Amino acid sequence: MLIDKFERKIDYIRVSVTSRCNFRCLYCMPNTPFEWEPHENILRYEEMFEFLRLAIDEGINKIRLTGGEPLLRKDLDVFVKMLHDYRPDLDLALTTNGYYLKEYAKKLKDAGLKRVNMSLDSLKPEVAAKIAQKDVLNRVIQGLDEALKVGLKVKLNTVVMQGINDTEILDLLEFAKNKGVTIRFIEFMENERAYPGVKRVDSKVILDKIAKKYKFKELPKDNSASRYFETEDGYVFGIIEPHNEDFCKSCNRIRLTAEGYLIPCLFFTESYNIKEALREGNIQKASEILREVVANKPEKNDWQDEEVSTRAFWETGG
């Protein structure tokens, strides 16, 4: 079992299988030229699996595959099956922008994937295109429908931004409610790689907008990053607010980047390279690094301090 120095049980790892993405979302991707990491620099599936097998044996029971856009990496369903076959009761999830989900949903479900989180930042084609910097909405909704059709559990994520999509909060909630899926509204997380001028909408403003139409109550907090609320007619939606001082209290996760770095906290610059140990087949060293990462997991993010990570979310797995 993995326990950090603040007595938090670490049982969840987010694994970025690629830093590449086919979107250029305003709140995530850099607004200056950059180069993708060469393929030879990223971990092979076999290397990821060797580490994750170790992590599972140490107490990890939830794995979320992220990116970048994870569906850009070939044979993701094969990797999912490797993990599922090793531990069939593993909570295997995927975070995706949904663009390729229509093509891959059934393969992933058949391989053992259980859940999908999808980005849906607008229901207006022109606004969705402005945010992602390409025409995406139709394909994203097709991906959502296919995921539901094959039996995947789905949540929608919406990053709310001032003057861009903050007038759509109720429309997005209604859309998710009609689809029978949970939607989570996310406060924009300031980072140096986002486009200038993108501003967050405070969670209180989001809740006030919803309260104009719905009465709701807050549900008891679990160890997720979200606060959840239930409307009088039984619909559940969520809020993710990294600016809240309680955001980190029950954090149970660490992150592995595609390039082979273990990260104890999304908002810190510290990272631990396990690629060399994995390529040498040194599982003992990889185990030691895993325990070091857990031991050095901070109590909370330094959101208001200068130490906040400048690492891009698309590099880290968000």
From Swiss-Prot:
The keyword ATP-binding does not apply. S-adenosyl-L-methionine binds at Y27, G68, S119, M189. One of its GO terms (molecular function) is S-adenosyl-L-methionine binding. Signal peptide: none annotated. GTP binds at R14, R64, T95, K155, R253, I254, R255. Binds 2 [4Fe-4S] clusters. Binds 1 [4Fe-4S] cluster coordinated with 3 cysteines and an exchangeable S-adenosyl-L-methionine and 1 [4Fe-4S] cluster coordinated with 3 cysteines and the GTP-derived substrate. This is GTP 3',8-cyclase. It comes from Nautilia profundicola (strain ATCC BAA-1463 / DSM 18972 / AmH). The lineage of its organism: Bacteria, Pseudomonadati, Campylobacterota, Epsilonproteobacteria, Nautiliales. The gene is moaA.
